[in-house]
Amino acid sequence: MNILITSAGRRVSLVRAFQKEIKQYFPDGKVYTTDVNPKLSSACQVADGFFKVNKVTEDRYIDYLIRLCVDNNIKIIIPTIDTELIPLVCNRDRFADVGVHCGV
């Protein structure tokens, strides 16, 4: 089981906290992150892997997140900015259909 933290930015302590906790329950678990510019994101640099994404307001953002989850065995999404909440809630059923829980 893996976790995805979206719009990771500078949330290094959040990524590290999830890395520590997931290993207790899922030794092979990974914490992935997304950001519009992951090479400049300190949280992306400490994550087990990262993905470049478009802004949440752009077309196909949700489709891309779903594909990332399916391709990388991601079961939980942790959003970190307010603008992600409504699109994630509105698409909660789509995520659930592929076995992903949105933390909203």
Where are these regions (language model features)?
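ATP-binding N-terminal substructure of ATP-dependent carboxylate-amine bond-forming enzymes
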Residues: M1-G103
